[in-house]
From Swiss-Prot:
Name used for this protein in its record: Dehydratase ustZ
Molecular function GO terms recorded: monooxygenase activity
Similarity-based family: Belongs to the tpcK family.
The protein's role, per its UniProt record: Dehydratase; part of the gene cluster that mediates the biosynthesis of ustilaginoidins, dimeric gamma-naphthopyrones isolated from different fungal species. The first step in the biosynthesis of ustilaginoidins is the production of gamma-naphthopyrone precursor YWA1 by the non-reducing polyketide synthase ustP, via condensation of one acetyl-CoA starter unit with 6 malonyl-CoA units. YWA1 is then probably substrate of the ustZ to yield norrubrofusarin via a dehydration reaction.
A UniProt-annotated Pfam family: EthD
E.C. code: 1.-.-.-
Entry keyword set: Monooxygenase, Oxidoreductase
Span of domain EthD: 18-113
Signal peptide: none
Organism expressing this protein natively: Ustilaginoidea virens
Catalytic activities: naphtopyrone YWA1 = norrubrofusarin + H2O + H(+)
Length: 140
């Protein structure tokens, strides 16, 4: 059983809805969807919420990193990372009427929810603002 100090991290490996450009997808997620959900995340005790989006430049950037270990580029359009202290935070947020009526249905406007994948696990911050962290303190 996990200690109460461990943080959970949900990674959503997302695909955009067909017909939406990468630029429009990122703009919608950052400027429309994120503001809808961020207040609920605060209300239910979430700690971090970040997004990274692939762009038109992503293939050329990956080419610069390519070698035997960096050969398999993922086809996802984004990665959303959400950190929270307990699964109840997420369960309670999803049960909130505002989530059910507004946030949940909003996903269908921009995301290919049938293809997107998720992974949950323990959050281990190892480098923050260019400084190494005590990785053991995050896992105690």
């Amino acid at each position: 059983m996990a200690s109460h100090h461990q943080l959970l991290c949900l990674n959503i490996l997302g695909f955009r809805k067909p017909g939406i450009s990468t630029e429009d997808y990122r703009n919608y997620m950052v400027n429309v969807h994120a503001p809808l959900v961020a207040g609920l995340m605060e209300k239910y005790g979430f700690l971090h919420f970040t997004m990274s989006h692939a762009s038109e430049q992503s293939p050329q950037l990956m080419d610069q990193l390519y070698d035997a270990q960096f050969a398999n580029t993922a086809s996802y359009d984004c990665c959303v990372q959400i950190v929270f202290p307990s699964i109840e935070c997420f369960v309670n947020m999803k049960a909130d009427p505002y989530f059910k009526q507004t946030v949940g249905p909003d996903h269908e406007k921009f995301a290919d929810t049938k293809r997107s994948q998720m992974m949950i696990g323990w959050f281990s911050p190892l480098l923050i603002n260019g400084q190494q962290t005590d990785s053991l303190s995050a896992a105690e």
